Amino acid sequence: MKGNGSTLLNASQQAPGVGEGGGPRPSWLASTLAFILIFTIVVDILGNLLVILSVYRNKKLRNAGNIFVVSLAIADLVVAIYPYPLVLTSIFNNGWNLGYLHCQISAFLMGLSVIGSIFNITGIAINRYCYICHSLKYDRLYSNKNSLCYVFLIWVLTLVAIMPNLQTGTLQYDPRIYSCTFTQSVSSAYTIAVVVFHFIVPMIIVIFCYLRIWILVLQVRRRVKPDSKPRLKPQDFRNFVTMFVVFVLFAICWAPLNFIGLIVASDPATMAPRIPEWLFVASYYMAYFNSCLNAIIYGLLNQNFRQEYKRILVSLFTAKMCFVDSSNDPADKIKCKPAPLIANNNLIKVDSV
């Protein structure tokens, strides 16, 4: 424990104004990183609270699939409430002065958030796969009770996955990014295991699920005759695309950092110094930025979320209660039932985020 504490103190002493190769860091760098982080924190908190409130208020959004969406929003909120503000403090102070305990808690919660996000995105992909490709079994597999159990299992697995970080000494302060985080160069074997099991394997599962969905949707569209009534509603397709975009942006934002981890783990002593500091910093803050994107995606691509966002914001400005069920709105009285699509299992339905 003392050894880790001294490592933290030594690292924090290296932070002020020192850049790659021991030279001075650009004066604008800290300001730019602070701006990115402030924007991320504000949009993360406001956006994900809107997501949670929207699902709570609107019966059309209160379904088994959106239980995973709320869980993902909670994972994104975790970093905005505690770790990111501490990183911001470190930027303003040009080093970490909050002590060893806060460093460990911050790094732990950051890892909890990212692994929780990956596992929830995987859960969402499996949910969409079952909904579309195995629609006859979906209601039995994804009752509200079962979905809550799946989300609980996701967070249990997340805790199990993150706990070894507390024992391996990999949670340390890195002055390059002003953050207490997972240190890739401490253990090659452990870093490779983290990247493989916490990123690559979940991504393979997600890619498989969405690839199967795309294939099935294309097959269904080709089977529909020109003179027949289309069975795949545009809104249904947009709802699926919404969650696909969430996955793609997550992969884009987190892939560079994970690939850097694999490169460093191959030979820490040789490869770590060869990673350009600008690339390392950019990959980290691109990953940080991802936590504020999901709520924006829902608002842009999903009509139900977009309408509920507007209602919540209007209710705030008109001093109405945000927690009132909005499903009694006249515009929502038209019930939308998912259209069955002839495909695998003879039925295919695409509905909800």
UniProtKB/Swiss-Prot annotation:
Major localisation: membrane
Can you say where in the cell this protein is located?
Cell membrane
Q: Which cysteines are joined by disulfide bonds?
A: C103-C180
Instruction: Check the record and name the InterPro entries matching this protein.
Output: GPCR_Rhodpsn, GPCR_Rhodpsn_7TM, Mel_1A/1B_rcpt, Melatonin_rcpt
- Transcription regulation as a keyword? no
Q: In which tissues is it expressed?
A: At least in the brain, more precisely in the pars tuberalis and the suprachiasmatic nucleus.
| Glycosylation: residue positions | N4, N10
Q: Name one GO cellular component term.
A: plasma membrane
Transmembrane residues, as ranges?
Answer: 33-53, 67-87, 106-126, 148-168, 191-211, 244-264, 278-298
Cytoplasmic membrane side: 54-66, 127-147, 212-243, 299-353
Q: Name one Pfam family in it.
A: 7tm_1
Origin: domain of life: Eukaryota
Keyword vocabulary terms for this entry? Cell membrane, Disulfide bond, G-protein coupled receptor, Glycoprotein, Membrane, Receptor, Transducer, Transmembrane, Transmembrane helix
Ranges in the topological domain labelled Extracellular: 1-32, 88-105, 169-190, 265-277
Put simply, this protein is called Melatonin receptor type 1A
Annotated source species: Phodopus sungorus (Striped hairy-footed hamster)
Species lineage: Eukaryota, Metazoa, Chordata, Craniata, Vertebrata
